[in-house]
Swiss-Prot record:
It comes from Shigella boydii serotype 4 (strain Sb227). Coiled coil: none annotated. The keyword Magnesium applies. This is 2-succinyl-5-enolpyruvyl-6-hydroxy-3-cyclohexene-1-carboxylate synthase. Belongs to the TPP enzyme family. MenD subfamily. One of its GO terms (biological process) is menaquinone biosynthetic process. Its cofactor is Mg(2+); Mn(2+); thiamine diphosphate. Binds 1 thiamine pyrophosphate per subunit. GO terms for molecular function: 2-succinyl-5-enolpyruvyl-6-hydroxy-3-cyclohexene-1-carboxylic-acid synthase activity; magnesium ion binding; manganese ion binding; thiamine pyrophosphate binding. It holds the Pfam family TPP_enzyme_C. The gene is menD. Keywords: Magnesium, Manganese, Menaquinone biosynthesis, Metal-binding, Thiamine pyrophosphate, Transferase. Catalyzes the thiamine diphosphate-dependent decarboxylation of 2-oxoglutarate and the subsequent addition of the resulting succinic semialdehyde-thiamine pyrophosphate anion to isochorismate to yield 2-succinyl-5-enolpyruvyl-6-hydroxy-3-cyclohexene-1-carboxylate (SEPHCHC). InterPro entries: MenaQ_synth_MenD, MenD_middle, THDP-binding, Thiamin_PyroP_enz_TPP-bd_dom, TPP_enzyme_TPP-bd. SUPFAM superfamilies: Thiamin diphosphate-binding fold (THDP-binding) (SSF52518).
Length: 556
């Protein structure tokens, strides 16, 4: 009997089971203990294989692939701290709904807690963050193959969103020629091997039913808040709100076209919040709201009803409003709850939104961070997509720009960490094959710098804008102690990214004005490669411009 051969047959059943649930992309890190899984994945022609030497980046690469494909993405890593490096991506997926299947190789039980190398307690290490956790036994023919495949099917068949952790212990030897060991065990699955359906089929249903009193509420004064959603959903939501005559407050991730732009500016005006107080119902479609003023208004508003519609489970409302939590696909929910043509009831807010945008436009000529955020829609590639980082840059784009309706926008706004942003952007590009504009800050770029290796492999032009304001300038917007702000919060690194781009053989530009930036973009969109554009800006201008605009718009 060959242990290595049966390890591979066991792994082949696991990998084949994944294909029956739509898994096509599989991300693999180097490792010895994961050899059975890696070789089984390599031999399965259903998979598109991705590799990376850093497990944290690999997890985020998978996250980006899942964001675009809307299908589960598998990750294979070896045992030990390699597994722990998947934690950030798993947490993000749990909050934003992407499906990740984490296949973590492990030492067999007799090598745990006895001083064996690279052996840690892996079962349960992700606590409550996976939607499902499976701790498989070591491969043995005493356990029928139908148990193994149905165990995988149950976890994936009932997966609505988030991650599945499948811990896979393998005993040595891990290498060797294949023989007939376990062949009859494998063949007991019969014609399942020629089929394309799961062994065990389950169909989870979390769809909320139609709200029977919608005909009543749609005649009231309402407000639509649009959070994270797909591009197609964004266009439908914009039309739905327009038909109802309800003001639409669109987040940067809503892809609604933000018909009332600069919401995070005009929500600081008392006239706007006073008018919004007249709303009898608020319907929030999508979660992960970005703007500080939007979140403040959302927390303080007191309509008769507050509805939240999202296909992710959970409350999704830090303000704990009285109302309804409706778990549904947004587009499907809109069809069940059609709009009735009515005249707009808000008068003051459209005027304030226009004046806020004009105030932003009046400042657009200076070469700076806030101005780039406002101009970002001018630089979007045709038939492309946008990936926005976290901290100051996403807040500036949310407050100062107006993105086109239906233009795809991606981000990691679940836990809102700055780890893995470049890796996620790489996954977004690979899954879509579209030209991609990604924008992050300098600390975010440093945090995931080795992901530039992933950006060497793109199928369409990708431009990475690094806004270098020399530190975490988001803390300039917070009441951090002035005496310790630079040392303990901003942490300026005084670095530039030309040599990093050169190390990974990526094109690089460092424009000094808008004309040079436009020239760099024109060059970048011509070829299917990655271009790093470093925009070096004054460290405080972005935060100060936002604060000045907030003060100006609050007094309109």
């Amino acid at each position: 009997m060959s242990v290595s051969a049966f390890n591979r047959r066991w792994a082949a059943v696991i990998l084949e089971a994944l294909t029956r649930h739509g898994v096509r992309h599989i991300c693999i890190a180097p490792g010895s203990r994961s050899t059975p899984l890696t070789l089984a994945a390599a031999e399965n022609s259903a998979f598109i294989h991705h590799t990376h030497f850093d497990e944290r980046g690999l997890g985020h690469l998978a996250l980006g692939l899942a964001k675009v494909s809307k299908q589960p993405v598998a990750v294979i890593v070896t045992s030990g701290t390699a597994v722990a490096n998947l934690y950030p991506a798993l947490i993000e997926a749990g909050l934003t709904g992407e499906k990740l299947i984490l296949l973590t190789a492990d030492r067999p039980p007799e090598l745990i807690d006895c001083g064996a190398n690279q052996a840690i307690r892996q079962p349960g290490m992700f606590a409550s963050h996976p939607t499902h956790s499976i701790s498989l036994p070591r491969p043995t023919q005493d356990i029928p193959a139908r148990w193994l495949v149905s165990t995988i099917d149950h976890a994936l068949g009932t997966l609505h969103a988030g991650g599945v952790h499948i811990n896979c212990p393998f005993a040595e030897p891990l290498y060797g020629e294949m023989d007939d060991t376990g062949l009859s065990w494998q063949q007991r699955l019969g014609d399942w091997w020629q089929d394309d359906k799961p062994w065990l089929r389950e169909a989870p249903s979390l769809e909320s039913e139609k709200q029977r009193d919608w005909f009543f509420w749609r005649q009231k004064r309402g407000v639509v808040v649009a959070g994270r959603m797909s591009a197609e959903e964004g266009k439908k939501v914009a039309l739905w709100a327009q038909t109802l005559g309800w003001p639409l407050i669109g987040d940067v991730l809503s892809q609604t076209g933000q018909p009332l732009p600069c919401a995070d500016l005009w929500l600081g005006n008392a006239k706007a919040t006073s008018e919004l107080q007249q709303a009898q119902i608020v319907v929030q479609l999508g979660s992960s709201l970005t703007g500080k003023r939007l979140l403040q208004w959302q927390a303080s508003c007191e309509p008769e009803e507050y509805w939240i519609v999202d296909d992710i489970e959970g409350r999704l409302d830090p303000a704990h409003h009285r109302g309804r939590r409706l778990i549904a696909n947004i587009a499907d929910w809109l069809e069940l709850h059609p709009a009735e043509k009515r005249q707009p009831w808000c008068v003051e807010i459209p005027r304030l939104a226009e004046q806020a945008m004009q105030a932003v436009i009046a400042r657009r000529d200076a070469f700076g961070e806030a101005q780039l955020a406002h101009r970002i829609s001018d630089y979007l590639p045709e038939q492309g997509q946008l990936f926005v980082g976290n901290s100051l840059v996403v807040r500036l784009i949310d407050a100062l720009s107006q993105l086109p309706a239906g233009y795809p926008v991606y981000s990691n706004r679940g836990a809102s960490g700055i780890d893995g942003l470049l890796s996620t952007a790489a996954g977004v590009q690979r899954a879509s094959g579209k030209p991609t504009l990604a924008i992050v800050g300098d600390l975010s770029a440093l945090y995931d710098l080795n992901a530039l290796a992933l950006l060497r492999q793109v199928s369409a032009p990708l431009v990475l804008i690094v806004v270098n304001n020399n530190g975490g300038q988001i803390f300039s917007l917070l009441p951090t102690p002035q005496s310790e702000r630079e040392r303990f919060y901003l942490m300026p690194q005084n670095v530039h990214f030309e040599h990093a781009a050169a190390m990974f053989e990526l094109k690089y530009h460092r424009p000094q004005n808008w004309q040079e930036l436009e020239t760099a973009f024109a060059d970048a969109w011509r070829t299917p490669t990655t271009t790093v554009i470093e925009m070096v800006v004054n460290d405080t201008d972005g935060a100060q411009t936002l604060q000045q605009l907030l003060a100006q718009v609050s007094h309109l």
